[in-house]
């Protein structure tokens, strides 16, 4: 009975370590996509299902580190002075409001909460914010609203538009491949040690090394008797 209790205890510890790793470095491929344009404002609401157990809330940018914290909620609301290039407002309903967007606002924003009863970690909500420049929008609007009349200008603009879109598509695809590779690598790194450690613990609990050693000793003893 003690053997199984000890095994269950170790498995629980390993699962907690895995949960903490996923909380500290979450998978950004599942983030909610948000887009905005320079000079505009953008609102990031929290999760729709806030538990009554939740007591502490916070917003982060780029990573779940104290230096990247934007807002902190306990019994009162506090706006942290980190990230001076990001002008924002934090509201009591836990919404993050980004003001006067620029290219510096692009990135991952995390909304994190922690259960105070039982200290149960969960994956934070994240937004992948992309800010586009107004100049790019103006070019596309001009092409659509004012089509050229001459054949030469039409061919030139069509060629330019096709080249621009192709370059954007290739750049976007390359970025996706690189992001998926960067995301897959750290997750693979902790799975392999977890499997190895779990296997060793199971072998020790069921005394497989001791049984193997006893069989080896008995085999050597029988060999010595046969030789004599």
Swiss-Prot record:
Q: Name one GO cellular component term.
A: host cell membrane
Q: Which residues form the signal peptide?
A: 1-19
Q: Which residues cross the membrane?
A: 189-209
Q: What kind of membrane protein is this, topologically? A: Single-pass membrane protein
Q: Which InterPro entries match?
A: Ig-like_dom_sf
**Major place of localization?**
host cell
Q: Which residues form a coiled coil?
A: none
Q: Which UniProt keywords apply?
A: Glycoprotein, Host membrane, Membrane, Signal, Transmembrane, Transmembrane helix
Q: Which residues are glycosylated?
A: 41, 93, 100, 128, 164
Report whether Glycoprotein shows up as a keyword of the record. yes
* Localization (cell): Host membrane
Q: Tell me its family.
A: Belongs to the HHV-5 UL9 family.
Return the protein name. Answer: Uncharacterized protein UL9
- Species of the source: Human cytomegalovirus (strain AD169)
**Lineage of this protein's species?**
Viruses, Duplodnaviria, Heunggongvirae, Peploviricota, Herviviricetes
């Amino acid at each position: 009975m003690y053997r199984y209790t000890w095994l269950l205890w170790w498995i629980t510890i390993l699962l907690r370590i895995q949960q903490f790793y996923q909380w500290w470095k979450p998978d950004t491929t599942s983030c909610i996509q948000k887009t905005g344009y320079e000079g505009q404002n953008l609102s990031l609401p929290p999760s729709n299902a806030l538990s009554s157990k939740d007591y502490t809330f916070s917003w982060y940018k780029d990573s779940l580190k104290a230096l990247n914290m934007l807002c902190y909620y306990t019994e009162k609301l506090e706006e942290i002075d980190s990230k001076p290039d990001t002008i924002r407002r934090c509201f009591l309903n836990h919404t993050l409001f980004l003001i006067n967007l620029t290219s510096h606002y692009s990135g991952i924003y995390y909304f994190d909460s922690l259960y105070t009863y039982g200290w149960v970690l969960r994956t934070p909500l994240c937004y992948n914010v992309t800010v586009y420049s107004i100049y790019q929008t103006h070019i596309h609007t001009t092409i659509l609203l004012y089509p050229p009349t001459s054949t030469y200008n039409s061919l030139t603009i069509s060629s330019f538009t096709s080249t621009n879109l192709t370059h954007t598509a290739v750049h976007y695809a390359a970025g996706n491949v690189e992001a998926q590779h960067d995301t897959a690598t750290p997750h693979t790194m902790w799975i392999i040690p977890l499997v190895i450690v779990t296997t060793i613990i199971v072998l020790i609990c069921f005394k497989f090394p001791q049984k193997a050693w006893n069989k080896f000793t008995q085999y050597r003893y029988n060999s010595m008797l046969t030789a004599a």
